[in-house]
Amino acid sequence: MGFPKVERLLINYKTLDEFKKFKGCGAQELSMLEELQANIIENDSESPFYGIYYGGSLIARMSLYMKRNGGEPFEITGTYLELYKLEVLPNFQKQGFGEMLVNYAKGLQFPIKTIARIHSAGFWDKLNFQPVSVPDGDFYVWHPEVNLNTVTNEESA
């Protein structure tokens, strides 16, 4: 068995069965199942779902969506990622799998917005996400570091 890695999940009935193992918080769990079912029906091959398999079973998952914003009502302007429904099965929590998923999203080098679940503020703080409060609700954002030492081909010519 190799080291677990993050991969884009296929939209199929096997993934649907794997999702049923996750017992999230109420309607949020159901919406992820319904979302996957809708993608199966529409034969949508561009899956927004990412996960980690361990021993042939899905143990952690998230949804990742590319969005655009004009700057209001929060501090991200332009293209960013929305990270939703990050969940790790109870027997695999506190082993770094949630962090692996978030680091995968960070590696795409876009700002990230997420809505923290109850009692997860410490997790997002540890991963350098900043809390943001707006009239519609609270969430966390992460911005990629800008490397000012990077020289483009045009600048070096």
UniProtKB/Swiss-Prot annotation:
Its EC number is 2.3.1.-. NCBIfam families: PRK13688.1. Pfam families: Acetyltransf_1. Keywords: Acyltransferase, Transferase. The keyword Transferase applies. GO terms for molecular function: acyltransferase activity, transferring groups other than amino-acyl groups. InterPro entries: Acyl_CoA_acyltransferase, GNAT_dom, YlbP. The keyword Transport does not apply. Residues 9-147 form the N-acetyltransferase domain. HAMAP family: Acetyltransf_YlbP. It comes from the Bacteria. It comes from Bacillus thuringiensis (strain Al Hakam). This is Uncharacterized N-acetyltransferase BALH_3551.
